[in-house]
Regions:
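Rossmann-like NAD(P)(H) cofactor-binding subdomain of soluble oxidoreductases
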Residues: 1-30, 34-36
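Conserved Rossmann-fold dehydrogenase catalytic segment
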Residues: 20-22, 43-67, 86-88, 113
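A charged, well-structured terminal subsegment
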Residues: 35-54, 126-133, 138-140
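Residues within well-ordered alpha helices
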Residues: 40, 78-83, 104
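An accessory alpha-helical subdomain
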Residues: 65, 79-98, 117-122
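Oxidoreductase and adenylate-handling cofactor-binding alpha/beta cores
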Residues: 71-77
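NAD(P)-dependent Rossmann-like dehydrogenase/reductase catalytic/cofactor-binding core
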Residues: 95, 99-153
Length: 153
């Protein structure tokens, strides 16, 4: 559509940097793959080159979960606050924990992420937490939300 609008023969690269890019972190999905654009975005984040335009919508859908992530942090922090934990301490603990978990996931991103789930102690607290959420269909609801976001694109 853009090519028709500008009426010039140009190469258009679609890129959507996410807000954490201001920290020099986070993904930038680009379509179509382009060496110069990749080099540019590699300096400020993690460039993901998409080879098929139809597949790009999958990445854009995932970006629609940022507020859900923040809401999860908010719920966890508020739970601690209701347990008489100081608000600042609650938020620092939760955000520091999830930042560290994200770093571990990134370090393991070449392996199946399911491995991190399976590393939890069977019958332990994390095992209980993930299984309670599975029984409540939390993860299925997350996929359902992703499918709705995808349809909007």
């Amino acid at each position: 559509k853009l090519k028709k609008l500008i009426k010039k023969k140009v190469t258009i690269i679609r890129a959507i940097p996410m807000p954490p890019i201001r920290l020099g972190k986070g993904p930038v999905a680009i379509f179509p793959p382009n060496k110069k654009v990749k080099i540019f975005f590699d300096k400020i984040g993690t460039t993901i080159e998409i080879k098929n335009e139809k597949l790009s919508k999958n990445f854009w859908a995932i970006s629609g979960t940022m507020a859900s992530f923040y809401e999860l942090l908010n719920v966890l922090s508020n739970w601690l606050i209701r347990k008489k934990i100081n608000k600042l301490d609650a938020q620092k603990y939760v955000t520091s924990l999830y930042s560290a978990l994200a770093e571990l996931a990134l370090l393991n991103s070449s392996k199946p992420l399911k491995n991190l789930v399976n590393e939890q102690t069977p019958g332990g607290l994390n095992w209980q937490g993930v299984n309670d959420l599975r029984k409540l269909s939390f993860y299925k609801l997350l996929e359902k939300s992703l499918n709705k976001i995808y349809k909007r694109l």
